[in-house]
Amino acid sequence: MISAVLDTQGDHPQQQAGDRAAPSVPVPGNKTVLPLARPNPNRKRVLFVTSEIADLVKTGGLGDVSAALPRAMAHLHDVRVLIPGYPQVLHSENPIHIIGELGGHAALPACKIGRMDMPDGLVIYVLICPELYEREGTPYGANNGRDWPDNHIRFARLGLAAADIAANLAQIHWCPDLVHAHDWPAGLAPAYMHWRGQRTPTLFTIHNLAYQGVVSLASCPELGIPEHALQQEGMEFYGKLSFLKAGMAYASHITTVSATYAQEITTPAFGCGLDGFLASKTQQGLLSGIPNGIDESWDAATDAHLLTPFSIGDWDGKAANAAHVRQMFGLDASSGPLFAVVSRLVYQKGLDLTEAVAEFIVQSGGQIAIIGRGEPEEEQSMRALARRFPGRIGVHIGFNETDARRMFAGSDFLLMPSRYEPCGLSQMYAQRFGSLPVARNTGGLADTIENGVTGFLFDESTVASYQEALTRAFKVFAYPALLNAMRCRAMAAPFNWCKAVEPYAELYEQLVAKALGQAARQ
């Protein structure tokens, strides 16, 4: 619901940093992230710029992080989120009050800024521009899977709005000390700020290097991109423009979502054509990896989504969840292992490898439950598997949080044969619910799974390597004491955001201090 009254006083000054005590942070599941002991004078105002947030609209891990990290950071810094006004946002149960207006630039239309206050205190700024964002579908395309042809306009408008807010052009009585932009849709935020000579520091986080927001050079006039940006050191990318590269080129610092992935993307195998550029950033000390966390709602003992909550050692409770998952997917009753796939159905996720080992899993006494949506050809392949192995493999095309949580709780193993995985969240969710990942030894999977302790890793993106890891999983399943010991270790793994937040908080403080120092010398 959008308030029809324009609040000419803008945002509320009493909500600025330093004017209220640092609270504990409510998160889903009636859990609380306890404050870390840090001095309040270091508290900064931070604007998160993102194309999705799990509370309102989500297509993947970016939405989860955009919802969890600002909340986990709330006791350290005043973090607010800027997101486009999609229908899912405008028609949520949370009221929106118009607090400011922004003029247009080049082909980017004028828009309004709305403020949404979430029940737990998170402030979300909504970029209201009906001609760009009020469309049925995902944040990036129509329901038929095709990207919107004007995405370059839609997300350039998002980046420019962030720059405008940082320059206080929106006059909302809140101005960030730092702008934290996420993935290619927010890539032009650091760029516009740099081109204008704004001194506010910027941080750009790469969640997935493969999605680069590449558009034609002919888009420059529409977006107001200066000619000097069309260089290898700028946002030029093999004769085109890359929103992702713009974020990397002009941000004060770059992070990605795991230490291993930060190393991998500086190599040709994982660099997506940007390995040399990123290697240079690493050498300059401008690229680092900070792992994601997961919120404390991922607790099998208290999760309201589960029909039978259970705790470490309560394996009868886990078995009850397994029986429910088998019923959900039309699988036969079985005492064998249940494997889960909870994933976007895209090439990156290695689903063709799972398709190739499916017969081995079934012949060895296992079953597979698959949930997800994505590329049409991948969806068709998964449906074909279910038809080929009725009662042994079940597929649901689509996604909802409740079913996903129940699958993590009911499965014995999670299949994640990703060709690359910047961080990955599913493997952490699964471990919290006692489901052991069978995963490729890459990116965040390598950083969050202890091979033979909390899961099973394999090195090569081949059927043989994958099948060897599955063989180890079947052997462990045959020894309940060993299986349960691994489950205990997995469920106790420390993946909460409290641990992940500290490096971000320190980086924020360093970037702001550096920017202030540079300004003082000029």
Swiss-Prot record:
GO MF entry, a single one: alpha-1,4-glucan glucosyltransferase (ADP-glucose donor) activity
Keywords annotated in UniProt: Glycogen biosynthesis, Glycosyltransferase, Transferase
Gene Ontology biological-process annotations: glycogen biosynthetic process
Enzyme class at the top of the EC tree: transferase
Binding site for ADP-alpha-D-glucose: K58
Domain of life: Bacteria
Parts of the chain that traverse the membrane: none
UniProt catalytic activity: [(1->4)-alpha-D-glucosyl](n) + ADP-alpha-D-glucose = [(1->4)-alpha-D-glucosyl](n+1) + ADP + H(+)
Annotated EC: 2.4.1.21
Region (Disordered): 1-29
SUPFAM superfamilies the record matches: UDP-Glycosyltransferase/glycogen phosphorylase
InterPro entries: Glyco_trans_1, GS/SS, Starch_synth_cat_dom
Pathway annotation from the record: Glycan biosynthesis; glycogen biosynthesis
Function text: Synthesizes alpha-1,4-glucan chains using ADP-glucose.
Entry similarity comment: Belongs to the glycosyltransferase 1 family. Bacterial/plant glycogen synthase subfamily.
PANTHER family (UniProt xref): GLYCOGEN SYNTHASE (PTHR45825:SF8), GRANULE-BOUND STARCH SYNTHASE 1, CHLOROPLASTIC/AMYLOPLASTIC (PTHR45825)
NCBIfam families, per database record: glgA, PRK00654.1-2, PRK00654.1-5
Record-given protein name: Glycogen synthase
Annotated source species: Pseudomonas fluorescens (strain ATCC BAA-477 / NRRL B-23932 / Pf-5)
Lineage: Bacteria, Pseudomonadati, Pseudomonadota, Gammaproteobacteria, Pseudomonadales
Gene behind the chain: glgA
